[in-house]
Amino acid sequence: MGEPQQVSALPPPPMQYIKEYTDENIQEGLAPKPPPPIKDSYMMFGNQFQCDDLIIRPLESQGIERLHPMQFDHKKELRKLNMSILINFLDLLDILIRSPGSIKREEKLEDLKLLFVHVHHLINEYRPHQARETLRVMMEVQKRQRLETAERFQKHLERVIEMIQNCLASLPDDLPHSEAGMRVKAEPMDADDSNNCTGQSDQQRENSGHRRDQIIEKDAALCVLIDEMNERP
């Protein structure tokens, strides 16, 4: 017979899959798909488990004697188990001193093992509560971060509105309104010979170009103010 196979505490590294999940394969959709969900049973740490098993199995289903009642206080039972472990450990030391080869040594070791199993079982029964508390804390942190982000956004928005109002207040009063600049004046096509093909004279084009230059300068000044605001901490 061959030697029993050693079961590793950790799964082996999936080196055969690393080369398949390159950036190019992922972009082109050539990366292997994830395995389908397990429906029946699976192996973990050398043991077989069923998918419909309870997360925390009762002690009786594992063939372990129950030392505490069905209805109990976890804190009190953990304190009692902790004290029992200490007393049994002292008894074990006494046995090792007086009669190391006695059969009571094995019995005391089994008692300690049973007590530790119960301690771990009671601690594991707190795992669902711990998961709920962890989820609650995580959601509270996310909520606080979103509120802080919204508050910072509101402050930046108020600063932008204030700067725009200051810029508007600094504009000259004789600056033409945007509506007047956007409005297109309909003129007959039979203009005199001094006008060009669009019905505008050279003087009108010069005036409109001058106004356009003034508006561009104001826009550039506003952009500089906004850039300075973004650079501030």
Curated annotation (Swiss-Prot):
Lineage summary: Eukaryota, Metazoa, Chordata, Craniata, Vertebrata
Official protein name in the record: Mediator of RNA polymerase II transcription subunit 7
Family: Belongs to the Mediator complex subunit 7 family.
Molecular functions (GO terms): transcription coregulator activity
Gene: MED7
Disulfide bonds: none
Highest rank taxon of the organism: Eukaryota
Subunit comment: Component of the Mediator complex, which is composed of MED1, MED4, MED6, MED7, MED8, MED9, MED10, MED11, MED12, MED13, MED13L, MED14, MED15, MED16, MED17, MED18, MED19, MED20, MED21, MED22, MED23, MED24, MED25, MED26, MED27, MED29, MED30, MED31, CCNC, CDK8 and CDC2L6/CDK11. The MED12, MED13, CCNC and CDK8 subunits form a distinct module termed the CDK8 module. Mediator containing the CDK8 module is less active than Mediator lacking this module in supporting transcriptional activation.
Crosslink feature (Glycyl lysine isopeptide (Lys-Gly) (interchain with G-Cter in SUMO1)) location: K185
Compartments, record wording: Nucleus
Composition bias, Basic and acidic residues: 203-213
Pfam families named among the record's database cross-references: Med7 (PF05983)
Alphabetized UniProt keyword annotations: Activator, Isopeptide bond, Nucleus, Phosphoprotein, Transcription, Transcription regulation, Ubl conjugation
Cellular compartments per GO CC: core mediator complex; mediator complex; nuclear body
Source organism: Sus scrofa (Pig)
Region (Disordered): 188-213
Residues joined by cross-link Glycyl lysine isopeptide (Lys-Gly) (interchain with G-Cter in SUMO2): K185
SUPFAM superfamilies (alphabetical): Mediator hinge subcomplex-like (SSF140718)
GO biological process entries: regulation of transcription by RNA polymerase II; somatic stem cell population maintenance
